[in-house]
Amino acid sequence: MTDEIQRNSNDSLVGLYVYGSLVTGDFDKDRSDIDLLAVVDSDVDGDTFDRLDRMHARFVEDHPAWEDRIEVAYVPAPALWNFRTQTEQIAVVSPGEPFHLKAAGKDWLINWYMVREVGVTLCGPPPRALMPEISQSEFVEAVREQAEAWKEWVCKMRTPGAQSYAVLTLCRALYTDTHGKQASKKQAALWARAYLPQWAPLIQQSSLWLSESQDKEADDKAGLQETVRFVHDVAGRITGTGESASDASG
């Protein structure tokens, strides 16, 4: 894919980096996503956008097993360097979404921290040459802010697959808040089952939903209620608000 991105980006590619579970561990070749950051020297628009859009469509046609399992963020180099202070347009293809433009700024700090710390260079300079320093404390604070935001986002997680994603994401956020570093969803779930025994059945069920071929698209209202309680409980622990699960359900 590196050569394809280089060719279809009209030679604007500055660097390409892979991160996520493929790098940090617990990658499942049949189910896990591949996360890529493509740094480009200018905005992705016009002909470049159209070429990349067609390239990603062809890739799925040629490799159907990877449908909805590739995430690439195309980020102009100035936008990456100034992400703390400026919100700029980037191009993204991600699971469940077509190739599209979106605004990105400080809300992408978690991604850029992981690229900077553990990203593997596929082409171009090391990622640290293209983005400013990001401290561990900044990373942990961003995870805490995202955990708080999940109290609102979780209400939209109506299918078992989405609910499982929410549960495991909050497990990972709690692990990061406790240990100051990132873990894979699998590692964080195993840890959280012991750390939060009252939630162990839900965490185990969520892990199974994401690892087995089941119908993840049917609405699950009962599951949503329990997931909402879990998210509010864990987010409260992370942010120090101390909101109980019963508060969330009421």
Protein language model features and the residues they cover:
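Extended, basic/helix-rich recognition subdomains
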Residues: E148-Q205
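Helical scaffold of the NTase/Pol beta-like nucleotidyltransferase catalytic core
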Residues: M1-Y17, D47-F49, G242
